[in-house]
From Swiss-Prot:
Its main location: cytoplasm. Disulfide bonds: none annotated. The gene is lysS. It comes from Shewanella sediminis (strain HAW-EB3). It holds the Pfam family tRNA_anti-codon. One of its GO terms (cellular component) is cytosol. It comes from the Bacteria. Its cofactor is Mg(2+). It is found in: Cytoplasm. Binds 3 Mg(2+) ions per subunit. This is Lysine--tRNA ligase.
Amino acid sequence: MTEQVQDENKLIAERRAKLEHIRENCPANGHPNTFDRKHKAADIQAEFGNNTKEELEGMGIVRSIAGRVMAKRGPFLVIQDVSGRIQAYAGKDVQKDLKAKFQGLDIGDIIGVTGQLHLSGKGDLYVNMEEYELLTKALRPLPEKFHGLTDQETRYRQRYIDLIVNEESREAFIMRSKVVSAIRNFMVKKEFMEVETPMMHTIPGGASARPFETHHNALDIAMYLRIAPELYLKRLVVGGFERVFEINRNFRNEGLSPRHNPEFTMMEFYMAYSDYKDLMDLTEEMLSSIATELCGSPKLPYGEHVVDFGGPYARLSMLDAIKKYNPDNATIQSMTYEEVKDVEFMRNLAKSLGMTIEKFWTCGQLLEEIFGETAETQLMQPTFITGYPADISPLARRNDDNHFITDRFEFFIGGREVANGFSELNDAEDQDNRFKAQVDAKDAGDDEAMFYDADYITALEHGLPPTAGQGIGIDRLVMLFTNTHTIRDVILFPAMRPQG
């Protein structure tokens, strides 16, 4: 047992003894639930922060606050609530009563205070403690003041401590909430209807990913946590709901990385009588307005860069992007779609770039992997990449001029994909053939290939109007709005490997 652990255990024992004494002298068994908190720290600071000491004393303002004790400086306590911090002052009479009744107040305890508002000699607002109550005794100490909670893994595993002591974390999750609310408000103003679709599917679909499998005992069938809501949302468009969206969780049984968490949040939407170009226009409008609304400017700092959400955003095909970011590769510079269709040519190109390839990769998969290897991380500013091959876009409509590619884009910012959208494939026979090709790919070893969904084909046979749909990764978008570089910093409780 380390000295640090011994010290912590000693502090915990001391606090438990204090709680036991409190229980012996408190009718609420040490956890009262009757304090009426009427005011928040930030509201008090905003309303009275500019008053002089004399003005406050003359006004006789009484305020009732509650929160966690974050510091003790002589007779002063720093109390933190959800809005911020404010001081409370314990005069001599109060200090004496506090000691007799509670046998010592510790950092981390939650208290309620009522009293008159004053200004300290240093110009700080404080509440003079006329009434007070210990609401919750903290049995464990907070991290030391100067060391804080610096271990990243502990921050993720014990997010409750992280939120108490790290203002940056609190601000990041407040921003996350604002981003989600702003997106929802934008969609409603655009006359989209918010819906909820199943989280458990009998057939996983809507994306190329490995699902989590579970079992429904009553029905005695295998079920899958959804990897995407796409096929259900498009069924609703078939049913006549022309503009729908859903903000919810998706689950993909894949690896962990700074960009990936197996449980993540997606906003997916579909609009009838539109195409993928309409989606790009809508995305520009949405992100520009949200950035300006929440941050006061469409230009946001991100690492060493400044990301400009103001638009217009760059648009180029996947093939052109590969050429742009490989200017000295003669083979790439002369490459045409005819060569992209040649799987041996693409295999040799990938190998020449030092890439490890899978034997079942198609021409489209090879093109996408080369793009990811050589171009994706260069896309710092908002960029729509178009021209995705049909063999990696089984739900997207083929391009009228080039049937090898589809009317699909992925949206990149900060060197990573944030959104994926396309004109929907509404040809039931073409969709049937593409599902069958996905089954063949799965049989060949591609774990992420899609399953065949007969009911979705039946829905298409009833007629899906010309439709465009898009999914936006909320977590990755929030990373940009909070200037964070790992997805775990914007997910309250990210997936972690079990300890021990």
